[in-house]
């Protein structure tokens, strides 16, 4: 299978990395493609601040034989939450709020029990107690925030402005605040609204101006440019039609409903592995990249520090008595992983992963679109093990 190689800064051996493990990585991806587990793969690996690998193989479309490219653009899904987290941390650094600021100080819908004990920290660590994403638990789907919003909108009499925040939390809490880790994307949507209200600026514009643009992430955005559309992974016919319209310069139908007012800060960004590796290296450099300061060193250290203690996790069949989680970042450890203690990461549905190891100064980002549409560990956990096996 042909492997297309992108631009690198140096050979792997120049940073103390065994290049034969890159070949092992390609072989692993080829096996997964042959088994129809993934359509293709694209990845970027950085070691000691230098890009040592950027390559792609397999298909860059779910509906054609178009080849995956080293600069393929894709939806990064929940990796978006890291950008939302950084934006929130910037506002904390600027003195507007603190991690333990009650959400009710910004969103009055949280002023009454049982919501009044929820802080920004709880939203950032998935411990607010709000009902989690659908699929986390068999019984959670009826209480999903999006379903609650939709149901409330159908009953809305049209007077005033529809309160999607109130509707989204109308199911109450599944667990007491701070008592259990439950993956909650809606919490990051709420953080997006909070960022907008604190900054006085649309949160999408804020993230682009304060995080994405200073990092010179030219292929990253909530909106899809013509150039991005030309290189977008095509997941279905409807997606192809949308990309074709963007390429042709045709205006997309504007969504003027209340849905368009809800922030896309839980999973709305598109990017490339090369752009995301710049974000990873900013974190490894304690908030700075190429002379541009995004965050201060102490804030990066706080984000990458284990936050939870004896807080259990039962999502998706887990049975962890002590969930390892930072601020915005997953810090999971266990037999599935070989990265260093203190590594922080995040997955994106569909699937993608960004893994950052401060001890080894190693970062990796990869996109592996599911072929059959079902999550499995081989394109994620196994890939991490192969990449980290190259350290000399």
Name every feature range the model reports, one short phrase each:
Residues 18, 81, 272:
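Short, conserved phosphate/pyrophosphate- and ester-handling motifs at nucleotide-, phospho-/glycolipid
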Residues 139, 353-354:
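Non-globular disordered terminal and juxtamembrane segments underlying protein topogenesis/assembly
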Residues 52-53, 354-355, 361-370:
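Short, well-ordered beta-strand elements
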Residues 31-44, 63-123, 175-186, 264-267:
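Short active-site loop at a secondary-structure junction
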Residues 3-6, 11-76, 98, 166, ...:
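Short, conserved catalytic-motif segment at the N-terminal edge
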Residues 2-5, 114-338:
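Short, surface-exposed loop or secondary-structure junction motifs
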């Amino acid at each position: 299978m042909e492997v297309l190689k992108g631009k690198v800064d140096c050979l792997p051996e120049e940073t103390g990395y065994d290049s034969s493990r890159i070949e092992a990585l390609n072989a692993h991806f080829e096996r997964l493609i042959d088994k129809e587990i993934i359509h293709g793969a694209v990845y970027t690996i950085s070691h000691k601040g230098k890009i040592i690998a950027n390559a792609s193989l397999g298909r860059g479309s779910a509906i054609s034989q178009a080849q995956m490219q080293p600069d393929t653009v894709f939806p990064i899904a929940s990796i978006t939450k890291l950008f939302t987290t950084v934006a929130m941390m910037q506002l904390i650094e600027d003195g507007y709020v603190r991690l333990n600021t009650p959400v009710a100080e910004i969103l009055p819908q949280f002023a009454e029990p049982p919501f009044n004990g929820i802080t920004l920290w709880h939203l950032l660590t998935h411990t607010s107690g709000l009902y989690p994403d659908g699929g986390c638990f068999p019984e959670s789907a009826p209480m999903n925030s999006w379903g609650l919003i939709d149901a409330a909108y159908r009953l809305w009499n049209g007077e005033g402005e529809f309160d999607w925040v109130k509707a989204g939390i109308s199911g109450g809490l599944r667990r007491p605040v701070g008592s259990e880790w439950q993956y909650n994307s809606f919490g990051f949507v709420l953080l997006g609204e909070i960022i907008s209200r604190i900054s006085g600026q649309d949160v999408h514009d804020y993230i682009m101006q304060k995080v994405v643009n200073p990092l010179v992430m030219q292929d990253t955005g909530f909106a899809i440019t013509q150039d991005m559309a030309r290189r977008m992974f095509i997941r279905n016919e409807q997606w192809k039609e949308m990309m074709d319209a963007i390429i042709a310069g045709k205006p997309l139908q504007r969504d003027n409903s209340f849905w368009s007012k809800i922030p896309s800060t839980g999973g709305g960004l598109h990017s490339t592995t090369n752009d995301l590796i710049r974000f990873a290296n900013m974190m490894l450099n304690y908030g700075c990249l190429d002379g541009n300061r995004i965050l201060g060193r102490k804030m990066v250290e706080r984000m990458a520090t284990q936050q939870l203690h004896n807080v259990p996790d039962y999502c998706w069949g887990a049975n962890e008595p002590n969930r390892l989680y930072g601020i915005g970042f997953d810090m999971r450890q266990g037999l599935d992983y070989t990265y260093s203690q203190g590594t922080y990461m995040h997955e994106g549905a569909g699937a993608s992963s960004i893994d950052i190891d401060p001890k080894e100064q190693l970062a990796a980002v990869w996109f592996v679109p599911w072929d059959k549409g079902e999550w499995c560990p081989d394109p994620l956990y196994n890939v991490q093990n192969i990449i980290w096996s190259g350290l000399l």
